[in-house]
């Protein structure tokens, strides 16, 4: 279960509120994503236009977790 995660690259379209973002993935699908815990702890700033890596659970492909800014 823990190793069944999907990783895709996307571009931040807008900040919804707080740590929630709207992301356009490389396959032209728009999803919502939130910051991973380590990124919150390090207070990483994410702005519209940034390219990020998004992690998905195979059970819910509409909500992702931003794990890295590229």
Swiss-Prot record:
Subcellular locations according to the entry: Cytoplasm
Signal sequence coordinates: none
Chief location bin: cytoplasm
GO MF term (any one): rRNA binding
Subunit text: Component of the 30S ribosomal translation pre-initiation complex which assembles on the 30S ribosome in the order IF-2 and IF-3, IF-1 and N-formylmethionyl-tRNA(fMet); mRNA recruitment can occur at any time during PIC assembly.
UniProt-listed Gene3D superfamilies: Nucleic acid-binding proteins
Described function: One of the essential components for the initiation of protein synthesis. Stabilizes the binding of IF-2 and IF-3 on the 30S subunit to which N-formylmethionyl-tRNA(fMet) subsequently binds. Helps modulate mRNA selection, yielding the 30S pre-initiation complex (PIC). Upon addition of the 50S ribosomal subunit IF-1, IF-2 and IF-3 are released leaving the mature 70S translation initiation complex.
Protein keywords: Cytoplasm, Initiation factor, Protein biosynthesis, RNA-binding, rRNA-binding
S1-like domain ranges (all copies): 1-70
Protein name, UniProt field: Translation initiation factor IF-1
SUPFAM superfamilies: Nucleic acid-binding proteins (SSF50249)
Family designation: Belongs to the IF-1 family.
Membrane-spanning ranges: none
Keyword Cytoplasm found: yes
InterPro entries: NA-bd_OB-fold, RNA-binding_domain_S1_IF1, TIF_IF1
Any one of the GO CC terms: cytosol
């Amino acid at each position: 279960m823990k190793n069944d995660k999907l990783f895709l690259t996307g571009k931040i379209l807008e900040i919804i509120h707080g740590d929630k973002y709207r992301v356009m993935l490389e396959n032209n699908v728009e999803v919502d994503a939130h910051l991973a815990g380590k990124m919150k702890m390090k207070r990483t700033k994410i702005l519209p236009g940034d390219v990020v890596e998004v992690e998905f659970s195979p059970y819910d492909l509409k909500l992702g977790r931003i794990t890295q800014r590229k």
